[in-house]
């Protein structure tokens, strides 16, 4: 078993890490780190458990340690659910010795830090060697993208491989859990929609092109098509919905696009990794699907569901669809865990 820990263990994504790591066949959760306010106390005493499942008994009495490299003990991999401002300061310190699989945004766009979706760009893990050489670390940092970016890019990948994408427009309807438990006051979101999420549109527009780019002699060359995003917070607990419009340079048959999505598999599926969904993208034909309440938990929340796939008659060589992905599973903790499973398998 590989000993692992969670940084930022008391927050919503930290709790999702704990839930997904409980009874994991390869990883044993031995360390929970949080702020100095929580350090030295049992996890069950300091964590206000938010998830709609019971807190695992294995962590209830586990003593929380400070978020400091000297405090985490004998671990091999650390999963980071830290806020971006904290992550930027402390993740490099941990990476001097440990493997850090980070969900935080702080280091994502560093030129020597792999930003990875295992089904999309596993070859970017080659940057680990570059990172260690440049920074003199024994460990390293690997990051996963923004939650909305992950769902979008998983659906774009089979299309990108088969056609030439000219531009992508995406409008997101994002669950409140993406902002954390205290992120959106109930009076601000009930009977309402908030048409702005700070920094979200920029993340989608840059990360998507980065992920679909090429690694050339240690340098990522982003994909060259345009991405335009508009992001909205909606009164849904879990599960981001995205309306996607794609313009291609090529003529296409919509049935071929559907087949490409349905048959899409990546390295995690070939390797049979524990957290890998059987199908990264599940295509549904019902007119009223996908819906977050009905589809966010597809394959344990690790698959993205696509529906309303159709040609767009208003524009040449264009298509549209709607997707739903679980933002704290596939879009956060599950993404980091799948990255770690891949690293554990191939490195």
Curated annotation (Swiss-Prot):
Similarity comment: Belongs to the aspartate-semialdehyde dehydrogenase family.
UniProt lists compositionally biased (Basic and acidic residues) regions at: 281-299
Keywords from the named record: Amino-acid biosynthesis, Diaminopimelate biosynthesis, Lysine biosynthesis, Methionine biosynthesis, NADP, Oxidoreductase, Threonine biosynthesis
Binding, NADP(+): 10-13, 37-38, 177-178, 327-328
Q: Which GO terms describe its molecular function?
A: aspartate-semialdehyde dehydrogenase activity; NAD binding; NADP binding; protein dimerization activity
What protein name is recorded for this chain? Answer: Aspartate-semialdehyde dehydrogenase
Q: Which reaction equation describes what this protein catalyses?
A: L-aspartate 4-semialdehyde + phosphate + NADP(+) = 4-phospho-L-aspartate + NADPH + H(+)
GO BP term, pick one: lysine biosynthetic process via diaminopimelate
The transmembrane residues are none
Whom does it interact with, and what assembly results? Homodimer.
Q: Which organism is it from?
A: Methanothermobacter thermautotrophicus (strain ATCC 29096 / DSM 1053 / JCM 10044 / NBRC 100330 / Delta H)
The answer, when asked if Amino-acid biosynthesis is one of the entry's keywords, is: yes
Query: Has the keyword NADP been applied to this entry?
Result: yes
State its Enzyme Commission number(s): 1.2.1.11
Which pathway does the database say it acts in?
Amino-acid biosynthesis; L-lysine biosynthesis via DAP pathway; (S)-tetrahydrodipicolinate from L-aspartate: step 2/4; Amino-acid biosynthesis; L-methionine biosynthesis via de novo pathway; L-homoserine from L-aspartate: step 2/3; Amino-acid biosynthesis; L-threonine biosynthesis; L-threonine from L-aspartate: step 2/5
The gene it comes from is asd
Highest taxon of the lineage: Archaea
* InterPro entries given in the database record: ASADH-related, Asp-semialdehyde_DH_CS, Asp_semi-ald_DH_pep-lack, Asp_semialdehyde_DH, NAD(P)-bd_dom_sf, Semialdehyde_DH_NAD-bd, Semialdhyde_DH_dimer_dom
Active-site feature positions:
147 (acyl-thioester intermediate), 240 (proton acceptor)
């Amino acid at each position: 078993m590989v000993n692992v820990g969670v940084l930022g263990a008391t927050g919503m994504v930290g709790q999702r890490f704990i839930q997904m790591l409980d009874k994991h066949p390869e990883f044993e959760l031995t360390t929970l780190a949080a702020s100095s306010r929580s350090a030295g106390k049992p996890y069950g005493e300091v964590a206000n458990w938010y998830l709609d499942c019971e807190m695992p008994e294995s962590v209830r009495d586990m003593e929380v340690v400070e978020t400091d490299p000297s405090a985490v003990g004998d671990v091999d991999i650390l999963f980071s659910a830290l806020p971006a401002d904290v992550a930027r300061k402390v993740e490099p310190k941990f990476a001097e010795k440990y493997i850090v699989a980070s969900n935080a945004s702080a280091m994502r766009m560093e030129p020597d830090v792999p930003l990875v979706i295992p089904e999309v760009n596993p070859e970017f893990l080659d940057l680990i060697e570059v990172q260690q050489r440049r920074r003199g670390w024994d460990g390293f940092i690997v990051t996963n993208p923004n939650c909305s970016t992950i769902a979008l890019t998983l659906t774009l990948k089979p299309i990108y491989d088969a056609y030439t994408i000219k531009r992508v427009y995406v409008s997101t309807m994002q669950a409140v859990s993406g902002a954390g438990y205290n992120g959106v006051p109930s009076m601000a979101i009930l009977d309402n929609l908030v048409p702005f999420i700070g920094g979200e549109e920029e993340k989608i527009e840059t990360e998507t092109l980065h992920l679909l780019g090429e690694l050339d002699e240690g340098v990522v060359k982003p994909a060259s098509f345009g991405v335009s995003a508009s992001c909205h917070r909606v009164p849904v607990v879990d599960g981001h919905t995205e309306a996607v419009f794609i313009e291609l340079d090529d003529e296409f048959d919509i049935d071929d696009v559907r087949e490409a999505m349905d048959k899409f598999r990546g390295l995690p599926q070939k390797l049979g990794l524990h957290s890998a969904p059987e199908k990264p993208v599940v295509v549904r034909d019902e007119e009223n699907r996908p819906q977050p309440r009905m589809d966010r938990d597809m394959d344990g929340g690790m698959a993205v569901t696509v529906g309303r796939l159709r040609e767009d008659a208003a524009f040449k060589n264009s298509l549209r669809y709607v997707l739903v992905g679980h933002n704290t599973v596939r879009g956060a903790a599950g993404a980091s865990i799948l990255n770690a499973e891949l690293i554990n398998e191939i490195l």
